[in-house]
A protein has these predicted regions:
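Extracytoplasmic metal-acquisition and chelation regions
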Residues: 1-247
């Protein structure tokens, strides 16, 4: 069994018919998960820990010390080409597909690549192709549209859609923006003829900005929080559709 640091990584492993457990607690997002005893125990019982790396999971150095070499930690970022400039690799279909391919290579090294996994990879390839079709269709309506986000984790996707990011209303998760910074962001958005405001959850800050700018507020899933009801491919399709519906 593998241990995945993030829900999206666990979804990829499950799509490939590989046994996997999720370290990330349901209530914590990808950046804010603190290391706890449950996570260490789960990792100790795994064949390997599969992580994004690059500092995304801030607890990885502490987990590595706790494991004392008993379970290897494998990071996807070390195998993605070209090297991503944004850690939200799951929102880029090219990097997401490369990640699945790397997980399969690790499975082969571990003796876990059988007929079921090869068949699962063919199904997974089809799911990626279907998402790519959705992307091309969405790009025809979204290309050139500007957006403002409460916290802009969307750029790996929005860049592929040809959208223009106007930055984050709240770059720091922990601190709300100053009133002047908020006004400056709104002024910048008006000059750019912003089309929408994006937020991952019900955000008073995002709602206020959307109301003042008179544009739609889009609840746009960053896929950072686990969702037991929907897998990676369903959530990505939903995110693309949510952006497209806003224009």
């Amino acid at each position: 069994m593998y241990a995945a640091t993030l829900a999206v990584v666990a979804d990829w492993a499950r799509a490939l018919e590989l046994p996997v457990a999720l370290l990330q607690p349901r209530s914590a997002d990808a950046h804010e998960t603190p290391l706890n005893v449950r996570m260490v125990r789960m990792a100790l019982g795994a064949r390997a820990v599969i992580a994004v790396g690059g500092g995304l999971e801030g607890y990885l150095p502490a987990l590595e010390r706790a494991l004392q070499g008993k379970t290897p930690i494998r990071t996807l970022l070390d195998h993605l080409r070209p090297t991503p400039d944004d850690l939200h690799i799951w929102l880029d279909l090219v990097y997401a597909r490369q990640s699945c391919e790397q997980i399969l290579r690790w499975a082969a090294q571990d003796g876990l690549l059988g007929l079921a996994q090869r068949q699962a990879w063919r199904r997974t390839e089809l799911l990626f192709r279907q998402l790519a079709v959705r992307m091309r269709e969405a790009r025809t309506t979204l290309q050139g549209k500007a957006y403002l986000a409460v916290h802009d984790a969307y750029r790996p996707l929005t860049q592929q859609l040809g959208m223009r990011s106007l930055g984050s209303l709240q770059p720091d998760h922990e601190r709300p923006p100053s009133l002047q910074a908020f006004r400056d962001a709104l002024a910048r958005a008006r000059r750019a003829r912003v089309a929408m405001v994006l937020c991952a959850d019900e955000s008073p800050l995002g709602a206020t900005a959307a109301r003042l700018l008179r544009v739609p507020l889009v609840l746009a899933d960053t896929l950072e929080m686990p969702d037991p009801q929907r897998d990676y491919f369903t959530r990505m399709a939903g995110l693309i559709d949510a952006l497209q519906r806003a224009v």
